Amino acid sequence: MEYFDMRKMSVNLWRNAAGETREICTFPPAKRDFYWRASIASIAANGEFSLFPGMERIVTLLEGGEMLLESADRFNHTLKPLQPFAFAADQVVKAKLTAGQMSMDFNIMTRLDVCKAKVRIAERTFTTFGSCGGVVFVINGAWQLGDKLLTTDQGACWFDGRHTLRLLQPQGKLLFSEINWLAGHSPDQVQ
């Protein structure tokens, strides 16, 4: 289990100067050719998503104005807060800030031939399904994960096992991504 606080994470500026990324984790850890990766991006200007052949990207708007995502003849989609949207990361996708204000989003990318991610918003106590990995990010409220208290802009990632997240207040929201291996794959094969 690895814990993080978005306010204390290192920031990588994009080459096109349209935004920045905070990498949460990758699997396998510290590998350039990852099977899955979680990150938080701040988008300050219109531009294109980086291409990642063979990957699927699920993007979830965390804050800021809505974002229009366009991919040639494939789709035009308005990204709204806390509504995950998946697309192939090997296609050119343009992002346009609809309100002209900076947006922040959560990204999970998975290798299409190895694993599959799901992203949900939780508003009550729950237990993960025992996947190959997962990431949680607190949108608001106070949540207990094991012996650790997580509050707004904090989270955790793991590479295996079942975990219970307890909401400690009457209300709270947590972004939760669970990654599952496709048939014939397991974490033991890649570490």
Swiss-Prot record:
Matches recorded under InterPro entries: RmlC-like_jellyroll, RmlC_Cupin_sf, Uncharacterised_HutD/Ves, Uncharacterised_Ves
Q: Out of the domains of life, which is the source?
A: Bacteria
Q: Which Pfam families match?
A: HutD (PF05962)
Question: What family is reported?
Answer: Belongs to the Ves family.
The entry's protein name is Protein Ves
Q: Which organism is it from?
A: Escherichia coli (strain 55989 / EAEC)
